[in-house]
């Protein structure tokens, strides 16, 4: 088993995944609906916490979702 991730790292990963779908307008897609709940479960996160993280760190999350270096 790998090293446990810090909460901020788990939030960042889930936020980037969600933002990548959001930027394409695919949050209602079967792919997102199939993947995202499992990611939340595996990372022991709630969607509300991910949304809060996105609001507080939007620039960095969007940059990562677009495959660009962190802001």
Name each model-derived stretch.
Residues 1-32:
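Extended serine/threonine-enriched, polar tracts that run as long, contiguous segments within proteins
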Residues 7-10, 38-41, 53:
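Short, low-complexity, polar/charged sequence segments that are solvent-exposed and flexible
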Residues 23-25, 42, 59, 67:
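Positively charged, low-complexity intrinsically disordered regions
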Residues 25-46:
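Domain-exit/linker segments immediately C-terminal to small folded modules
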Residues 48-71:
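Glycine- and charge-rich intrinsically disordered segments
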């Amino acid at each position: 088993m790998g090293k446990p991730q810090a909460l901020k790292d788990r939030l960042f990963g889930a936020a980037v995944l969600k933002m990548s779908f959001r930027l394409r307008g695919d949050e209602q897609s079967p792919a997102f609906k199939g993947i995202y709940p499992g990611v939340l479960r595996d990372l022991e996160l709630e969607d509300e916490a991910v949304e809060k993280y996105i609001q507080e760190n939007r620039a960095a999350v969007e940059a990562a979702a677009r495959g660009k270096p962190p802001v």
